[in-house]
Amino acid sequence: MRALISVYEKEGLIDFVKGLLDLGFDLVASGGTSVLLRENGMAHSSVEEVTGAAEMLDGRVKTLHPSVHGAILADLDKESHRQDLAKRSIVPFDLVVCNLYPFFERPGIETIDVGGPTMIRAAAKNHAHVAVVVDPADYSEILSELKALGSVSADTRRSLALKAFELTARYDAAISNWLAGGDSSEKLPKRITLTLERAAILRYGENPHQVGARYRQPGVRSWWDDARLLSGMELSYLNIFDTDAAWRFLHEFEGEPAVAIIKHANPCGFAMRSAIEDAYKTAFEGDPISAFGGIVAINRNVDVSLAGMILSKPKADVIIAPSYDDEALQLMATKRKNTRLIAAPVPERSSIEVRTIGSGFLIQDRDNFRVALGDFKVVSKAQLSDDQVLDVDIAWKLCARTSSNAIVIVKDKMAIGIGAGQQNRVDSARIAVEKAGDKVVGSVAASDAFFPFRDGLDALANAGVSVIVSPGGSIRDQEIIDAADEAGVALIFTGERHFRH
């Protein structure tokens, strides 16, 4: 039997080649692979010896030769193919082992592989006669099958071919998207080639009768790949969805210890304090009923003191933090066996959002904050105090991550009332005021979009809110400003809407 080996990633290769030689394989290797085998005293022929042509153009042309591709592509069931091989003294390959230049990790012209994908596609096309191995993780299985059967089975060859075409498809997609990203004339390219690989099978989807899985882009490492589930049940679809929202939202804030609580992808608690234990306690006080069974994100290490505070509060479905002390982890894992405890790195900022509409897609760039706090405009006669500036920032960011129509009320760096997902802004305001209770007096409220009429602002002002933040932009803006002046509240226009659906 005969094998062609041309790999960039050489992990596990020496043991694999040793196994092939022990099975009596005749080996042909290209470029750096040949050098490695020679250094390890492994018998083989170089591609140059087979083709009679030296590699050229700094290695860009090595295996693109009839003596190589004829040996890969020959359909040995056809007499004409066998005659062509005999006429040219070409010996067919039974096995092609190949992986690619690291374009996923280092995009660039010089990491665009040409010969590798060509060999892989040729071998995968001819999987009736050739086994193509593109993943070092398959080496041991291939050796075991060769030892047991004397050849690679048809079923295995087919599954290897599928993996090979998936690899070349992902590889080409990465190159296409990289080139498209270089065109600065359009914020969104005319074509987006999306390839995904399954990263995890989930217990179920949004509901128990639905199947679910987490996928990722090949070669693009998500923070989820480095997150560690330290205790508790496996994560469900909704656990991941809400935890992702909570962790990303918490990282909108820097500096002080902070805790965010998310339920059904909406904030229902938030607090910043000088001590993380106080932040945890205060975050739950904002809406303790909704917080039960929620996702709790913490931006500090969890020690025994914080673990004690966590155990004194309603049960969370998931707790995510940068790290946990061993004693704290053991305590919580014992007392709250079903709570999922996750240690996670800082989440990356993705540039686009993708949603499905039937068989099509909606794509937009991510809703980032483009207008800085310092550029907000106070449009009312009343002004806000210096100690309300941070509350304005918190309320505005909370509001942007809450389902529209959204009204968020904040006081002393704590969310005290959140009205989310209502079909009219007045109802959102009334819900937020009701949840805030007596704390509403002297608070800051934020609206994710403009007030179309003064009734929403009146509901907040009459309850005792002293500062209201809104994008502005309504044809009735002056009416809204007049209403704020009548009530004596400070009104801020940000100039930036943050609908969320």
Tell me what each language-model feature is.
Residues M1-I5, G70, F93-C98, Y171-A173, ...:
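ATP-dependent carboxylate/acyl-activation modules
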Residues M119, N126-Y139:
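Mobile "lid/hinge" segments at catalytic clefts and subdomain interfaces of large enzymes
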Residues L27, H44, V130-V132, L341, ...:
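Hydrophobic beta-strand scaffold residues
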